[in-house]
Swiss-Prot record:
It comes from the Eukaryota. This is Large ribosomal subunit protein uL16c. The gene is rpl16. The keyword DNA damage does not apply. PROSITE patterns: RIBOSOMAL_L16_1, RIBOSOMAL_L16_2. It comes from Marchantia polymorpha (Common liverwort). The lineage of its organism: Eukaryota, Viridiplantae, Streptophyta, Embryophyta, Marchantiophyta. Part of the 50S ribosomal subunit. It holds the Pfam family Ribosomal_L16.
Length: 143
């Protein structure tokens, strides 16, 4: 599972998911990306499940880039505890994803294989996504 090696602070505020992604919304590394259409938190387990699905379908062909990293700690209080007594302890890590953010990029495989692999990975995500090609940025297909 992905998680930061060290952080300046152990706990964070919740924040908000308003607006669209201004960073990480252009194709940088691969040829076929998977782009988010909704705002959400994506856990490190979901990112890993998507990565496994893509690499297993591509069968060691091509190269995969993961464009998001879970750097936000989510805290959970123990069950049946009374109010007060501070914030809970960090349980897992999430990546904050806004609409337009690119989640994965793949290259070195055909478009059909990339589309099918990204479709399998899209089922693992808690949000709606779309598959984009570099040649046809105008006609985007929602997955």
């Amino acid at each position: 599972m992905l998680s930061p090696k060290r952080t300046k602070f152990r706990k964070q505020h919740c924040g908000n998911l308003k607006g669209i992604s201004t960073r990480g919304n252009v194709i940088c590394f691969g040829k076929f990306p998977l782009q988010a259409l909704e705002p959400s938190w994506i856990t490190s387990r979901q990112i890993e499940a998507g990565r496994r699905a893509i690499t297993r379908y591509a069968r060691r062909g091509g190269k995969l880039w993961i464009r998001i990293f879970p750097d936000k700690p989510i805290t959970i209080r123990p069950a049946e505890t009374r109010m007060g007594s501070g914030k809970g302890s960090p349980e897992y890590w999430v990546a904050v994803v806004k609409p337009g953010k690119i989640l994965y990029e793949i290259s070195g495989v055909s478009e059909n294989i990339a589309r099918a692999a990204m479709k399998i990975a899209a089922y693992k995500m808690p949000i709606r996504t779309q598959f984009i090609t570099t040649s046809s940025l105008n006609k985007k297909q929602e997955i």
